[in-house]
Every structure is written in structure tokens, then in C-alpha cells.
């Protein structure tokens, strides 16, 4: 397929405000491509070259990209930088420069073949893999070879892609729906395969080749989508929901981690499927010493502890581990303990279809607890009073509360069901609980906030529609530094119109691709005619909103937008306010 065909589809996707139109455009695009091309097209649309856990990054900033455009067009870098500053879009700067240039190899002169999708993808992969001495010059040379042959519109999307600002916001579930329609594959089966092996590029190629989905199996080294929990506000409700008895375990305030042990070593993946092994060399060493299996997939929580007292510290302390340099110092200053709570695979045995109580037994069989690796503290209860005693014990130890689970539950990858239920101390009265919401729009600041965003439009996610519904407009809780940071992190996702996956009655000054997740707290969940979350679910014509919302200061970079608080959770929180449990 010619790259120009893909670019036409990208432009149409960018222009639409309707998700159904987006799906139709993708279906048409997939049908025109070969199986090999479909996988590469999917990666490109998602703004990636490989799945997230492989950590393949282009390593190209705006200046390097403009150097490549300069080399291809002859335009001065300073001229291109001025154009970029004027437009605010490196892609538009590249498009204008290419349109104004008289390149000897231009297609218009008939001396060059048009760019092919595979050719562009393969070249970009070479750019990402260029490392060491002379890597930047190599990247510039490779990129300029693409720009030299690209049409202005093609150059726009190549430039946006390489600097990570494609701005399409096509979700994984949208891709899955389009693949299902394009190849006549059952959508639920495709979704299940994706939960097991969440590499959409590989999966797209697989279905395009007509291969059966049952060939996709859980594989050590490839992270699965994590199972997620619902929430309730009292022990009696939780036990009733779980059928009368529950495995209750401490809910540690750390970083959720999926640990893969293979003959090649230990890999640690985040809830967003990113490889975070480099941040936790101490955990890697501890797992090798504590786990007897040759191959295993384990789940646990990495918790920061005080080096002097051993007391558990808040999640924020783990941020020191995210620096790529001087990890050894961070390990010494911010030690951790790994609390394991599940096992999904052991030495060729897929345990995801086995009941939790059996998985617990298998976990205890393969783990020899140490001061660095422990099994999460748990008990089985069928009495609400006993659950509450355990809850208070857990909180007094520095945890967030309990996770209560059905003893007979299987591991439902990627699902947020009622087999796992969070019981946190924050749920003890009205909306003392926080919610994780997605930034979908912003409003220009005034006075001290002039030149930045003064408030943000936030939304909850609905997995049944793959859409985001507004919940509140928040401007409180942000320091000057926060406002500057928010402005900077949101710029790559700025788009000229409301995103097709966002449902909003409010008109924001600026719209964004749903990507950035922040934590918010408020006085209560209230009915609102201004917001679309759960519109009509409680009363006709009104939705749910957070009253007096305030930013807590916590950026949830560990969560994807699809892992944000759901509309169902918002409705549940609203209902629970009517059954307030008075704090003791």
C-alpha cells in the first residue's frame, strides 16, 4: 500500500467528530492493505512502532526532526523553527516547508517511486534502533530520506509521528472493532485474545492472515491486561455481592506490578504494560531468590518502605525510582518490598481459568518469603464484623484498606467486574474518596493564570461504548507549578475540535485527545444538567458531576485513559452517598 493512502485515512480520522465514522474509515483502510501492512498500519495509528513493553522509542525531539526537514528541503533550521513556533505544530511546519521546496527527487518530476507503508515503517524502526556514537546524525539521515520523497501531507504525518504528536486518539477498542468488522472475526473473541496478548499490531496481522484466535495464549514475557476491581462502601455489601464469603487482602499503596520469570531473567511490567524492570533491580534480585519456578507470571504491589523503620511509605515515594540515571542511589535511599497477591502461570500451567483459592495455594508453593518478597496478608471471612476488624488492622499498618475477592473467581484479564471489590478507608463517608479522571478539554486562564490553562474539563470512561463522558470542570488545587506542568504535558494532545470519543455539553476553549489522567476529590457526587456522565441514569436530562472538585496533586501517569474511573463507578459512588456509613 502506498503511504499516501494511509495519510488520506489519517486526515479523515483527524477531521471527524464521530466515532462510528472513525471505525468505518479504519475498516476501509484495513481492507485495502496486505496482512503484513495491516500490523504496521495499526502500530502507526496508535503512535507506536512496537508494543509498549518492548520500550522502542524513536528518540527524536522537534529540533532533530526539523534538522531532517532542513536537510531534505534546503530550508534553514532557524526558518523552520520560526515556522514551528508560529504554527505550534511540527507537522504543519514540515508540510509548509515541503510544499515550498523544490526537491530534485520529488514525485512531481517522475523520478521517484511513491513511499510505501512498509518502507516508511521499516525506516522509522531503523531510526528508533540507531544508538551510540553518531546516532543523531544517522537518525537525521534516515528521516531526511523519507522527507525528501514525501508529499507535503505525508511529511506532516511523518513529522508528527516521530515527535510523538500524531493526535489521533484512536483507542485500542476502536481498532478491535474495526478489525472485527474488516475480517469478520467475533469481536468478543478478538477482545479476549487482546487481553491475553495485548499487541494490536501482531493481533491485526494474525486475523488478517486468517489464523484462528485460539492460537493466542498466555506467554511469559508478554504482559496480560490486568484484572481490575469495583468498589463498595461497607463490609456487609461486599460479602453480599461476593456470595457470602470473601478472600480479603491488604490493599497496599504502591505500584502494581506484573512480574514475569523466564529462563532469560525477570521482567517487571506496569499496569500500563510498560517495562519498568530498570527501576527495580532490587526486586529482580529478590524475585530470583524467592521464587522456585522456572517460568511464572506473578502479580503484586511494589511498596516503598522507610530504610530505617521498615514502615510502609506512600506511593509517591516510588517516583524517585523512575529516573533512568543513578538508579543505584534511588534503590539505597528508597528501598521496596514486593507483596505478591496472584499467580497466573507456572511452568507451562495456565492458571487464569482456575479459582482464586487454588491460585493462592500455588502461589504459596512457589514463593519462599523473604524480607524483600512477601505474600500479601489475607484472610477468608464470612462475617462483616470480622472484615471490619481486618480492615482497621490493615489501615493501621499503613495500607489503603482491603481488596475483597470471590474465592471461586477466575482471573478475568482486562475486566473490571464484581469478583474483586475495593474497600478503602476513603469510602467511609460521602465523597472523601478520590476519582481518577481524564482531561478532555481546558479553559484559558485569566489574571495570574493568563497564558496557561485556568481550568480543565474532566471525564469518566465507559468501556461499553469506548467513550468519555464529562464529570466536572476543575480549577482548584493547582499550584503555579502544576498549571505550568499541565500546560506542557497536554500540548502534544491538543486538537482543533472535540475528540470523537468525548461526549460533552460544555464547550471547552481547547480540546485534547483523551490521554492524561489526574486524581480529583470533591465534596460529593451530584446531579447536573451540564455533564454527560450517566446522563438520564438517575433522572431524565441530567448527568452526574463532582461538586466542588479539587486536584489532589497526583498525576496518574501509571493509568491509561481506559483505566480511569468508569461511569459505572461514578453511578455507584452516587448511590452509596445515600447509604453513608458514619465514621467511628
From Swiss-Prot:
The active site is at residue 251. The keyword Ion transport does not apply. Keywords: ATP-binding, Cell cycle, Cell division, DNA damage, DNA recombination, DNA repair, DNA replication, Ligase, Magnesium, Metal-binding, Nucleotide-binding. It comes from the Archaea. Its cofactor is Mg(2+). Its EC number is 6.5.1.1. GO terms for molecular function: ATP binding; DNA binding; DNA ligase (ATP) activity; metal ion binding. GO terms for biological process: cell division; DNA biosynthetic process; DNA recombination; DNA repair; lagging strand elongation. InterPro entries: ATP-dep_DNA_ligase, DNA_ligae_ATP-dep_bac/arc, DNA_ligase_ATP-dep, DNA_ligase_ATP-dep_C, DNA_ligase_ATP-dep_cent, DNA_ligase_ATP-dep_CS, DNA_ligase_ATP-dep_N, DNA_ligase_N_sf. It catalyses: ATP + (deoxyribonucleotide)n-3'-hydroxyl + 5'-phospho-(deoxyribonucleotide)m = (deoxyribonucleotide)n+m + AMP + diphosphate. ATP binds at residues 249, 256, 271, 301, 341, 416, 422. DNA ligase that seals nicks in double-stranded DNA during DNA replication, DNA recombination and DNA repair. Belongs to the ATP-dependent DNA ligase family. This is DNA ligase. It comes from Pyrobaculum aerophilum (strain ATCC 51768 / DSM 7523 / JCM 9630 / CIP 104966 / NBRC 100827 / IM2).
Amino acid at each position: 500500500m502506498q503511504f499516501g493512502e494511509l495519510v488520506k485515512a489519517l486526515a479523515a480520522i483527524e477531521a471527524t467528530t464521530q466515532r462510528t465514522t472513525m471505525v468505518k474509515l479504519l475498516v476501509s483502510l484495513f481492507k485495502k492493505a496486505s496482512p503484513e501492512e495491516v500490523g504496521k498500519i495499526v502500530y502507526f495509528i496508535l503512535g507506536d512502532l512496537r508494543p509498549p513493553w518492548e520500550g522502542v522509542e524513536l528518540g527524536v525531539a522537534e529540533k532533530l526532526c526539523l534538522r531532517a526537514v532542513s536537510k531534505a528541503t534546503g530550508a534553514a533550521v532557524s526558518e523552520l523553527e520560526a515556522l514551528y513556533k508560529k504554527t505550534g505544530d511540527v507537522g504543519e511546519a514540515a508540510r509548509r516547508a515541503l510544499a515550498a521546496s523544490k526537491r530534485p527527487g520529488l514525485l512531481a518530476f517522475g523520478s521517484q517511486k511513491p513511499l510505501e507503508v512498509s518502507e516508511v515503517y521499516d525506516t522509522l524502526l531503523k531510526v528508533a534502533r540507531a544508538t551510540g556514537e553518531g546516532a543523531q546524525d544517522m537518525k537525521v539521515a534516515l528521516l531526511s530520506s523519507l522527507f525528501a520523497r514525501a508529499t507535503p501531507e505525508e511529511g506532516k504525518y511523518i513529522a508528527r509521528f516521530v515527535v510523538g504528536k500524531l493526535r489521533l486518539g484512536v483507542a485500542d477498542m476502536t481498532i478491535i472493532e474495526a478489525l472485527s468488522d474488516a475480517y469478520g472475526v467475533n469481536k468478543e473473541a478478538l477482545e479476549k485474545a487482546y487481553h491475553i496478548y495485548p499487541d494490536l499490531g501482531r493481533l491485526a496481522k494474525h486475523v488478517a492472515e486468517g489464523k484462528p484466535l485460539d492460537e493466542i495464549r498466555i506467554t511469559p514475557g508478554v504482559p496480560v491486561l490486568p484484572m481490575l476491581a469495583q468498589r463498595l462502601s461497607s463490609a456487609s455489601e461486599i460479602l453480599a455481592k461476593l456470595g457470602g464469603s470473601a478472600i480479603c487482602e491488604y490493599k497496599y499503596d504502591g505500584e502494581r506490578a506484573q512480574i514475569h520469570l523466564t529462563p532469560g531473567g525477570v521482567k517487571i511490567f506496569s499496569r500500563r504494560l510498560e517495562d519498568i524492570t530498570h527501576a527495580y533491580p532490587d526486586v529482580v534480585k529478590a524475585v530470583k531468590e524467592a521464587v522456585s519456578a522456572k517460568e511464572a507470571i506473578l502479580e503484586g504491589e511494589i511498596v516503598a518502605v522507610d530504610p530505617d523503620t521498615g514502615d510502609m511509605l506512600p506511593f509517591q515515594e516510588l517516583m524517585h525510582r523512575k529516573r533512568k540515571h543513578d538508579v543505584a542511589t534511588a534503590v539505597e535511599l528508597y528501598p521496596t518490598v514486593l507483596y505478591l497477591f496472584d499467580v497466573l502461570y507456572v511452568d507451562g500451567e495456565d492458571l487464569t481459568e482456575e479459582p482464586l483459592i487454588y491460585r493462592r495455594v500455588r502461589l504459596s508453593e512457589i514463593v519462599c518469603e523473604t524480607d524483600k518478597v512477601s505474600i500479601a496478608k489475607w484472610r477468608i471471612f464470612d462475617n462483616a464484623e470480622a472484615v471490619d476488624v481486618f480492615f482497621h488492622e490493615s489501615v493501621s499498618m499503613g495500607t489503603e484498606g482491603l481488596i475483597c475477592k470471590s474465592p471461586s473467581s477466575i482471573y478475568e484479564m482486562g475486566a473490571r467486574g464484581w469478583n474483586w471489590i475495593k474497600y478503602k478507608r476513603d469510602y467511609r463517608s460521602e465523597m472523601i474518596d478520590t476519582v481518577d479522571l481524564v482531561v478532555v478539554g481546558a479553559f484559558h486562564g485569566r489574571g495570574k493564570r493568563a497564558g496557561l490553562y485556568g481550568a480543565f474539563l474532566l471525564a469518566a470512561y465507559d468501556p461499553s461504548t469506548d467513550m468519555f463522558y464529562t464529570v466536572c470542570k476543575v480549577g482548584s488545587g493547582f499550584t503555579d507549578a502544576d498549571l505550568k506542568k499541565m500546560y506542557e504535558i497536554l500540548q502534544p494532545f491538543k486538537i482543533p475540535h472535540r475528540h470523537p470519543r468525548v461526549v460533552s455539553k460544555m464547550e471547552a476553549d481547547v480540546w485534547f485527545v483523551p490521554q492524561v489522567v489526574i486524581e480529583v476529590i470533591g465534596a460529593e457526587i451530584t446531579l447536573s444538567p451540564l455533564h454527560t456522565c450517566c446522563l438520564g441514569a438517575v433522572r431524565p436530562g441530567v448527568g452526574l458531576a463532582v461538586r466542588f472538585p479539587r486536584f489532589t496533586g497526583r498525576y496518574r501517569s501509571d493509568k491509561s485513559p481506559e483505566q480511569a474511573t468508569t461511569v459505572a463507578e461514578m453511578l455507584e459512588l452516587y448511590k452509596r452517598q445515600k447509604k453513608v456509613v458514619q465514621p467511628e
